[in-house]
Amino acid sequence: KGEGAFLNDEPIHVSGAETLSESLVTIGTSPYYHELADWNFKVFKEVFLSCQDIRRLGSAALDMAYVACGRVDAFFEAILQPWDFSAAKLLIEEAGGKVTDFAGKELPVGMPGAVLAGNGKINEELLRILSEK
C-alpha cells in the first residue's frame, strides 16, 4: 500500500474523465439477487442516458481492474462479496481512484455490500443516481 499500481511493471492510473457524460461505465448484476432486477434496470437506464455507454463484462474484479488502469471510468454493483472487491479496491485506490458504497461511505471490511468504483471525478454524479433510485 502506498506504492502505486502497476501493470507489466508500468504505472497505471484511473481515467481523467471529468464528467459522467464523457464516461464509459461498467455495470454488475448477480445471479443470486433476482429481486434486484427492477432496481438494476431502472438504474442502468438512468446511467446509460447520462454517460457515453455502459458495458457488462461479467466479472467485478475485471471491471474494477479496468477502472484502475483507465480503460473504463467507473463500475458499480448493488451487492458484492468482499472477496469480489477487496483486492481491486486497493488497486483502484493506488491508481488514484475512489471506491465507496452507494452512500459515498467507506466499504465495511469483510462484509458484502454495494460498491461504486470510479476515477474519483465522476463518483459524485453516479452517487446521485444510485442514491435516488
Language-model features: locations:
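Alpha-to-beta junction loops
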Residues: C69-A74, G97-K98
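Small-residue (primarily alanine) positions within well-ordered alpha-helices
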Residues: A5, A88, A95-G97
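Acidic beta-strand-loop-alpha-helix segment within the catalytic core
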Residues: K1-L62, P112-K133
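Hydrophobic residues within well-ordered alpha-helices
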Residues: A65-A68, K89-E94
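Acidic donor-binding loop at a coil-to-helix junction in glycosyltransferase catalytic cores
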Residues: W83
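Acidic, metal-binding active-site segment of PIN/NYN-like and related structure-specific nucleases
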Residues: G96-M111
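Short secondary-structure boundary segments
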Residues: T29, A78-L80, A103-K105
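A short, glycine/Asx- and small/polar-enriched loop/turn
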Residues: L20, A68-R71, V109-P112
